């Protein structure tokens, strides 16, 4: 038992997409284009931006009429395009469909611009292809701002330091100029000579005092050295030689004593079989 409905048989032809004609290289158009340097698979035009694929036939698989499927949300009749054409011819921009057409044209121009920016030839590739960009996080922006702030602070500090140095230089130059003017104007040449003579006398006195102190210290050092030499000569040589001998023999005698003790203990352990067994860990 089959379904209660009219049976429809569909007979598809041998070559529904007309590929036999498309692949035929003996056609006049194919020969003419190949004589100009065209190769199968290339597009037409200076930049070869023309269509590469052949035009295909689409089969209508339904019995619906024109305007049965909605092209827009508001238009069902399928006559909106004609209204737009008439509106453009009459110069009426408020006609139905004119705004939609303008929007389509603007969209196409925008897509072409984006394709040119991306360096792509076809609009289809520009719709699918998305250019990648560098990821800039908030942290990198914050770091840039911090570096800029540090540079500003350093510049301000350097400018303030330079200003302080300039002030100090000016102040010191003013002081020097004041001193020069005061010494040149207030003091007479006679007074200056007296001052210089006094200073020379003071220097001479100081030099004499220092030289006398050095002589006294040198004589006292010589006397102390002589006394030490006399004391060393008075001491007997015998006591010094005995002490040297004692100091030299002490470590050697201690070393030999410990060595003898160790050898005696070793001999006692080897001679006693019980002690040997205990050392080697042998039972029985």
Curated annotation (Swiss-Prot):
InterPro entries: G_patch_dom (IPR000467), PINX1 (IPR050656). Residues 149-253 are annotated as: Disordered. PROSITE patterns: G_PATCH. GO terms for molecular function: RNA binding. GO terms for biological process: ribosome biogenesis; rRNA processing. The keyword Phosphoprotein applies. Residues 25-71 form the G-patch domain. Residues 166-181, 196-206 have a biased composition (Basic residues). It is found in: Nucleus, Nucleolus. It comes from the Eukaryota. Keywords: Nucleus, Phosphoprotein, Ribosome biogenesis, rRNA processing. Residues 207-224, 233-249 have a biased composition (Basic and acidic residues). GO terms for cellular component: nucleolus; nucleus. The modification Phosphoserine is found at residues 159-160. Belongs to the PINX1 family. PANTHER family: G PATCH DOMAIN CONTAINING PROTEIN, PROTEIN PXR1. Involved in rRNA-processing at A0, A1 and A2 sites and negatively regulates telomerase. This is Protein pxr1.
């Amino acid at each position: 038992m089959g379904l209660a409905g009219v049976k429809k048989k569909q007979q598809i032809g041998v070559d529904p997409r007309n590929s036999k004609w498309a692949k035929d290289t003996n056609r006049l158009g194919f020969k003419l284009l190949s004589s100009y340097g065209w190769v199968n698979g290339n597009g037409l035009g200076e930049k070869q931006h023309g269509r590469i694929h052949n035009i295909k036939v689409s089969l209508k698989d339904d019995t619906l009429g024109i305007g049965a499927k909605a092209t827009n949300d508001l238009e069902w009749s399928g006559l909106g395009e004609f209204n737009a054409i008439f509106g453009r011819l009459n110069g009426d921009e408020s006609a139905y469909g004119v705004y939609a057409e303008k929007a389509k044209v603007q969209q196409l121009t925008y897509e072409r611009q984006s394709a040119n920016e991306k360096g792509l030839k076809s609009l289809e590739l520009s719709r699918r292809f998305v250019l990648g960009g560098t990821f800039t996080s908030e942290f990198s922006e914050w770091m840039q701002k911090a570096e800029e702030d540090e540079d500003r602070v350093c510049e301000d500090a350097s400018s303030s330091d330079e200003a302080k140095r300039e002030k100090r230089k000016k102040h010191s130059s003013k002081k020097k100029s004041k001193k020069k003017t005061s010494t040149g104007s207030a003091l007479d040449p006679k007074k200056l000579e007296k001052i210089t003579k006094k200073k020379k006398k003071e220097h001479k006195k100081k030099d004499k005092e220092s030289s006398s102190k050095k002589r006294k210290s040198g004589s006292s050092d010589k006397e102390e050295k002589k006394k030490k030499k006399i004391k060393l000569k008075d001491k007997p040589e015998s006591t010094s030689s005995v002490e040297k001998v004692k100091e030299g023999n002490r470590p050697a005698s201690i070393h030999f004593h410990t060595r003898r003790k160790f050898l005696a203990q070793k001999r006692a352990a080897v001679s006693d079989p019980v002690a040997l067994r205990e050392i080697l860990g042998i039972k029985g």
